[in-house]
Design a protein with these regions (language model features):
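Extracellular/periplasmic catalytic domains that process cell-envelope and extracellular macromolecules
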Residues: 34-38, 93-94, 123-124, 134-135, ...
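Short, glycine-anchored, charge-dense loop/turn motifs used at functional sites
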Residues: 112, 130-141
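Small/polar-residue-rich segments within soluble enzyme cores
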Residues: 1-97
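Conserved short loop/turn motifs at secondary-structure junctions
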Residues: 1-6, 129-130, 251-257
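Beta-lactam-recognizing serine transpeptidase/beta-lactamase-like catalytic domain environment
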Residues: 78-88, 136-191, 196-301
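Short N-terminal helix-loop-first-beta-strand/juxtamembrane motif that initiates sensory/input modules
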Residues: 23-27, 121-135
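Conserved, well-ordered alpha-helix/loop/beta-strand core segments that scaffold catalytic motifs
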Residues: 2-5, 85-128
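Extracytoplasmic/secreted envelope proteins and their assembly/folding machinery
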Residues: 14, 18, 41-45, 59-63, ...
Length: 301
């Protein structure tokens, strides 16, 4: 019988073993995935393990599409594993895997990564994420999570204390390093959600473009003092100016006019309670208050 002694032997070692011409010892060639751009879009592309199976990202999502089928050579050997001469061998030809073309744009991805790296350094942040999408068709042109990792060395941690870690600690750090924060983590939308509030209120007719509001820099809602980002307030302004100023009191006022029921209806109609079904593993779901739990303060914030 045949026994595999060691997988993933480097080429130099394999060539030396061949030179010894040892009876019954055979070096089989294998293939390893190589990533020419090292860190580019590392968490999106993903990487393969020692058995060439996808581990994260597109590599694992499209494993069955990319992997193909191995070929085989069936021979007859003696008890020592040496092939018998004059005996016909059967060959099963390999079937190549398919090619996957992504919507990522190399230039846009590279530029976004450079910009994110600059912010990471300037702000001394733990991480910076950028997602650039074509809103007309949903194509992703760039998905950045810096610091990225080297796809050709995916098990190498950029941590000086790596040698002091337990196996469990090291695996946890690797899992965090491989995590695609753009889709695996949830985060508060902040003022970007004012777009949803504006659309819902305009559609329902609870506000018009020339409605006027007064912003003293805060609103008292029940027992909460909710501030605007401009401490002294924006004063008197129209709804359009309120949008331009991203004025919190304006949106608190129109949100209360809309009410929680209609607000939740539009939340669902915009698809915010559903997954996007992006073809990457581990998309996080929306975290939202239950309808019955949305009171004046929740609606205002």
């Amino acid at each position: 019988s045949m026994e595999k002694i060691s997988p993933n032997v480097d080429k130099k070692t394999g060539d030396r073993i061949r030179e010894y011409n040892l009876p019954g010892v055979k070096v089989d060639e294998d293939f390893k995935r190589y990533y020419p751009y090292d860190r580019l879009a590392s968490r999106v592309l993903g990487f393969t393990g020692s058995d060439n199976q996808g581990i994260i990202g597109l590599e694992v999502k499209y494993e069955d599409v990319l992997k193909g089928t191995n070929g085989k050579i069936l021979t007859v050997t003696d008890a020592r594993g040496i092939e018998l001469e004059g005996v016909a061998e059967d060959r099963i030809e390999p079937v190549a895997g398919n090619t996957l073309k992504t919507s990522l744009d190399y230039n846009i991805q590279s530029y976004c990564e450079q910009a994110a790296e600059k912010v990471l350094e300037e702000k001394q942040a733990e991480g910076v994420s950028v997602l650039l999408m074509n809103p007309q068709n949903g194509e992703i042109y760039a998905m950045v999570n810096v610091p990225e990792f080297n796809l050709n060395e995916p098990y190498r941690l950029n941590d000086k204390t790596e040698d002091q870690m337990t196996d469990e600690e090291r695996q946890n750090r690797l899992n965090q390093m491989w995590r695609n924060r753009c889709i695996n983590d949830t985060y508060e939308p902040g003022s970007t959600f004012k777009i949803i509030t504006s659309a819902a209120c305009l559609e329902e007719g609870v506000v018009s473009l020339d409605d006027t509001f007064s912003c003293p820099g805060y609103r008292i809602v029940e027992d909460r003092k909710i501030r605007c980002h401009k401490v002294g307030g924006h004063g008197t302004e129209t709804f359009v100016q309120g949008i331009e100023n991203s004025c919190n009191p304006v949106f608190m006022d129109i949100g209360l006019r809309l009410g929680s029921e209609r607000f939740c209806d539009y939340f669902e109609q915009f698809g915010l309670m559903s997954l996007t079904n992006i073809d990457l593993p581990g998309e996080a779901g929306t975290i939202m208050h239950k309808r019955e739990d949305i009171k004046a303060v929740e609606l205002a914030t």
